[in-house]
Every structure is written in C-alpha cells, then in structure tokens.
C-alpha cells in the first residue's frame, strides 16, 4: 500500500501548469508571498514549538484563505505532508479536485493519481499494519474509520469530547489503557498522539467486533453510538444487516456506517485490495 508521493508529485505539477495555464517556469515549491504570510510564519513557529493544535488551526486558516489559488494550494500540500498535517493535505487535495473540475470524477485517467493518493492516503501505515495484525482487523477498515472520524487529523476534537484520529472519548480510552497496561498513566492529551490513539482505538474496534460476532455494521454502529444502543436495535431486527442498518434510530449512525462503506470501497479500488 505504500506509495511514493514525491515521484507522483512531479507529473502532477506539470499537469497543474497545463490545467491552470501557468507558465512552465513556475516554481511549484516556493512562493515568497505565501511563505512570508503571517499565518504561515505562525504555523511554522507553533509546529517548531510542538504546539501542533495551534499550528493545525493556522494551516487550516491559510488553506481557506488560498482556496481559490490552485498553485498555492499545491505548494501547501507539500508542506502539510512534510510536517504531518495530513488532514490539511487531504482537504487541499479536495480543493484541487474542485478547482480543476474533477471533484465528481476523482478516478478519471486524466486526473493525476497524486491527488487521489493524498485524499485517500495510507497515512500512519506502519502503525496501522501493526495494529491490524495485532487485533485481526482489516487495514482498509482502520483507514476508513480514521478517514470518517477525523480525516487523519491528530488534533481533531468533537463537541462531545472525543479526540484524535479515531475520535475516542477519554473515559473509554482510559479504561482500555488501564485494562491492557498500554500506558502506565493516562492523560486525555495522550489521545492527540496518533500512535496512542490508534492503539487504543483499534483495541476498542476489535472489542466491538468480538462482542457482535464479526458483524461489521453492528460493530461500527457500536463504535459510533455505543454497544447498549446496538443491542436494543438488534433485538428489533435480528441478524439481517440491511434491516439492521435501516432500523438504527440515530440518523448520524446510519450515515456514519454508509460513509465508511463508501470510503472502504474507494480505498479498495485505489489500493487494489
């Protein structure tokens, strides 16, 4: 599943010049104006200081400000990837697709695969592969859940308090960390560390799959809405997955599962699995 993005970036850059009528001499890596923008300078300084949540906020604002400029968005993608701000890179690739008219046809042969591999990136791949093997999970399922939960944003946080790439509630994560001995002490901020979040989230997803006897729909519903709710829905529907999906009383959870199925199918198509 590993992809050499730097190699794919070269033809993507040439395509960008043609698609947006840019001079062939255009510098695709650097812009004095962009890299001296106060927001860019703040983001880089926050990143240097390890204040990743603040850096992420600044990068997101900078991307929004430049969302009509395909060239600067392309330049920012490289910065985001180099610095590990994968959510911003993913969002930037969507902007390129929109500006170039490929938002609805991202798999077109005329559209550079560079952007598709960024939007559906196999980020944190060594950790995902290790977690998948440890907990007998599908690598693509883990990628799909992370995509749906956070778009690979390490600093992602929900209004309900869920945090990190797999959007774990601190109480749930602490329980798993304590039971498994994975962390000797647990702080909610540990969930902002992708490796910790992935380990705890994979453990929880594997637990849900065990409880619901390998039923993906039921396990995903439990991951999103809690196992208690899922058990009450099963009591009404039995084992038919389609009936179960339509009986889920929370629209958010129904949409959640359908989104993950679609994301999973796209990952399967892109990576040939």
Q: Where on the chain are the PLM-derived regions?
A:
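Alpha-helical segment of the N-proximal tetratricopeptide repeat
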Residues: 29-61
């Amino acid at each position: 599943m590993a992809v050499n993005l730097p190699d794919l970036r070269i033809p993507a850059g040439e395509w960008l010049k043609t698609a947006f009528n840019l001079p062939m001499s255009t510098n695709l890596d650097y812009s004095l104006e962009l890299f001296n923008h106060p927001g860019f300078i703040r983001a880089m300084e926050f990143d240097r200081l390890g204040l990743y949540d603040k850096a992420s906020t600044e990068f997101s604002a900078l991307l929004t400000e430049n969302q009509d400029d395909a060239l600067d968005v392309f330049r920012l993608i490289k910065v985001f990837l180099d610095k590990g701000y994968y959510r911003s890179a993913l969002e930037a690739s969507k902007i390129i697709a929109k500006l170039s008219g490929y938002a609805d046809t991202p798999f077109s042969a005329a559209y550079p695969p560079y952007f598709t591999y960024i939007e559906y990136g196999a980020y944190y791949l060594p950790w995902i592969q290790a977690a998948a093997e440890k907990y007998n999970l599908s690598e693509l399922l883990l990628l799909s859940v992370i995509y749906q939960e956070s778009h690979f944003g390490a600093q992602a946080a929900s209004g309900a308090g869920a945090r990190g790439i797999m959007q774990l509630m601190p109480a749930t994560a602490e329980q798993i960390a304590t039971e498994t001995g994975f962390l000797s002490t647990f702080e909610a901020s540990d969930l902002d560390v992708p490796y910790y979040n992935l380990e705890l989230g994979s453990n929880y997803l594997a637990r849900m799959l065990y409880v619901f006897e390998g039923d993906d729909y039921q396990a995903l519903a439990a991951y999103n809405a809690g196992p208690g709710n899922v058990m009450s829905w099963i009591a009404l529907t039995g084992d038919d997955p389609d009936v179960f999906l339509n009986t889920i009383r929370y629209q958010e959870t129904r949409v959640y599962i359908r989104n993950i199925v679609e994301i999973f199918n796209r990952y399967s198509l892109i990576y040939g699995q």
